[in-house]
């Protein structure tokens, strides 16, 4: 069982994975190469001044795994709350468990909604500044928490 499961390997998911792994928290991140990140231009994420989304994803994945994060090249089809935390099912059929779950799926909010989170009037999933939701140990980061695309400043 991982301590933290992260669904999504865009800027939000990779940032979370990097900081968790740097702090010796067992982290598993799920993502695929098929992503709109390839068309993005990012500024000042992970200490990188400016870079295309494809290169950012490559470097972010490498940084996170260098610090011990486990990267699973898969999409997640199902997420469930359990007594011990969360269990997710990848498109391969494999299941993974963790105490904490971070959803960083961009504008796709279906997994968040399947866990009981609701969209606000603006269409975004609500979370505190610390990314906490009303579901214990469930966090939501990145565009999942915003109604439209913006540039975050870190």
Residue ranges and their predicted role:
Residues 2-55:
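Beta1-alpha1 glycine-rich phosphate/pyrophosphate-binding loop at the start
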Residues 5-7, 95-107:
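Short hydrophobic core segments
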Residues 15, 19-20, 101, 111, ...:
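Hydrophobic/aromatic ligand-binding patch that stacks against planar heteroaromatic rings
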Residues 26, 70, 118:
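Residue-level detector of anion-binding/catalytic polar loops
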Residues 38-92:
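N-terminal Rossmann-like dinucleotide/flavin-binding domain of flavoprotein oxidoreductases
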Residues 108-146:
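FAD-site-proximal beta/loop scaffold in flavoenzymes
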Residues 146-154:
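Short, glycine-/small-residue-rich phosphate/pyrophosphate-handling segment
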């Amino acid at each position: 069982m991982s301590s933290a499961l992260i669904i999504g390997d865009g800027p939000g998911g990779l940032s979370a994975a990097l900081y968790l792994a740097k702090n010796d928290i067992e982290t598993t991140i799920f993502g695929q190469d098929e992503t709109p990140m390839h068309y993005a231009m990012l500024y000042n994420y992970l200490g990188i001044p400016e870079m295309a989304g494809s290169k950012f994803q490559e470097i972010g994945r490498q940084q996170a795994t260098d610090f011990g994060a486990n990267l699973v090249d898969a999409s997640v089809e199902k997420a469930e709350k359990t007594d011990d935390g969360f269990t997710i099912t990848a498109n391969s059929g494999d299941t993974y468990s963790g105490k904490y779950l971070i959803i960083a799926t961009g504008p796709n909010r279906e997994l968040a909604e399947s866990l009981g989170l609701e969209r606000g009037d603006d269409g975004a999933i609500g979370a505190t500044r610390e990314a906490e939701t009303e579901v214990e140990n469930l966090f939501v980061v990145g565009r999942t928490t915003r109604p439209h695309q913006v540039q975050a400043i870190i």
